[in-house]
């Protein structure tokens, strides 16, 4: 493992929408991220099920759409004081906060809260399921442009400069309208002085120095390579390797399997520079592990799904690759530290967890 190959962007993305996690739980996640040498915390703050950040001038967002979660579980939101605590805690741990409002898809919670985001003025019902791709902002709705500008201007103002605009899985958005809406979100961030991050579907609209996050290896990669040639930087989050909500095996109670199962060995056995054919190595900004919380309700749930795989993802982000024998031999000692912090973990096979 060579320190000289460390990536600049070493991140963890946490979904606080499908299930809500309060400030103290978010800070505990930060402690874990910092422990593993990560330097970015990406918080997914809006989706079909809920809206998690209070926005001045748009009280309906939290009044009508903050209490939703998957399966009807309790929701919640962060007010200005909560967000200040989160931001200060991140800074004190060497973490740059990267907040995300996901648009134009994944927007049922916003559409439910604000009649003016719907062309006919009729709000859809709240959503507690796990399907994706059915909701979208509409250019024709009277409040869309003002809403997009207001929420992203505020998010940029209260962030550390990086703002994620989403852009994924907009299956119900017509192509030209998608382009117009993505331009609307990105322009709002740029005009407010922020740096744009977006999911890979929005790669064609990114500019020099901005970042695209690659998550689905099954999608065509030409637009990502083309973006890299324009000077866009690439964050690698391949779902088959570092989506840490994937079940470890078929017997895992938590998690999902839409990208198969992901044991520790699969997270550890990959090389970022080989993920996308034709992608220049110098275009890779780094690696970001992700955890989506459809099935996770508590910090212990998060911890169990993150560990030990986050240790592997973080080592790849720091060093570029892993020597499995060396990594595996060191895990029992690392796990003793985890126990001191009150973290729980999956006892992946092939590791002598009781050694020492």
Tell what function each PLM region has.
Residues 1-134, 143-145, 149-160:
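Feature activates predominantly on carbohydrate-active enzymes
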Residues 12, 33, 97, 165, ...:
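Conserved, mostly hydrophobic/aromatic
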Residues 17, 46-50, 100-106, 168-170, ...:
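Active-site beta-loop-alpha junctions enriched in small/polar residues
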Residues 39-40, 96, 195, 233, ...:
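Residue-level detector of anion-binding/catalytic polar loops
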Residues 110-211, 215-232:
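Active-site neighborhood of glycoside hydrolase catalytic domains
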Residues 206-210, 216-356:
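Flexible, acidic glycine-rich loops studded with aromatic residues
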